[in-house]
Amino acid sequence: MITRRGVLKFIGGVMATGAALGAYAFVIEPGFLLRTKHYAFAPPRWTPGLKLRLVLLADPHLAEPHMPLSRWQKIIATANDLGGDLTLLLGDYAAGHSWRTGSVPVAATAKAAAAIEAPLGVYSINGNHDWWDDRNAQRKGDGPVLAERAMADNGILTLANRAIRLTKDGQAFWLSGTDSMAAIVKGRGRFESRADINAALAAVTDDAPVIHMAHEPDLFMHIPERVSLTVSGHTHGGQLRLFGYSPVVPSAYGNRLAYGHIVEDGRNLVVSGGLGCSILPVRFGVPPEITVIDLG
């Protein structure tokens, strides 16, 4: 029999559950959790015997209280313990939402990144928020943006539509990168790209495998088969993700490119879940992550 006391207990239970879920999604998962996500595979056109470990740090969106400088420094210390040959910074260092109690200057973000240890180097690309956060770049319609200059001041090269040739154990490979596809704000929901995959790959002069850094995974649809692997961030895995589905994904392709290891037409893409938040400081089902990829 339904009683008033029973109804009140039920309502109280629902409210308590909602409060607990809200606290988890708005405080605990985005502000305190960190996982390491591992992938291991040999992509097409990969040199036999070439073993390479990539450590990806995507979308930190530094701002207090969820991603203060101290937390970024701890994440870097964790990344340094993962034994990466290369550490790749996939953009969006600037704050991604207005629900913050304090800002972190990009100069401080880059200075902390100088502590990253990787024998083959640390490389960066710009994210859309790095462009949006630079009023001068928006006015001129051109870079280099503040984040790129800050990284350069700390010895970190930004691969903005360019490529470099690297070697490990005498075996060569290329690392290329493109700028953001949503760099210049042209109006509500309208952006102008500064990504140029042709310019990035123009420097590739031999048949060594290519790893490409693209902030937005949508660029994957324009990546030629010549590229063995594309790595991206930007989506944060949708920030809300249940049973492999995210209701909102900042991609023209929705969940198709939201998160994880994606293989299409023999081409490989890994989309990191990233570290920070944008629009709202919320994460549920896709905690902040450091992404590790073992190739070969």
Short names for language-model regions:
Residues 1, 19-55, 74-77:
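C-terminal segment of N-terminal export signals and the immediately downstream linker at the start
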Residues 1-18:
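N-terminal secretory signal peptides and thylakoid transit peptides that target proteins
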Residues 43-54, 156, 163-175, 263-268:
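Beta-strand-turn-beta hairpins that frame and shape the catalytic cleft
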Residues 55-146, 154:
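Membrane-embedded segments
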Residues 57-58, 87-92, 121-128, 159-161, ...:
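Active-site neighborhood of phospho(di)ester-bond hydrolases with catalytic His/Asp-centered motifs
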Residues 211, 216-291:
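Conserved beta-sheet core of the metallophosphoesterase superfamily
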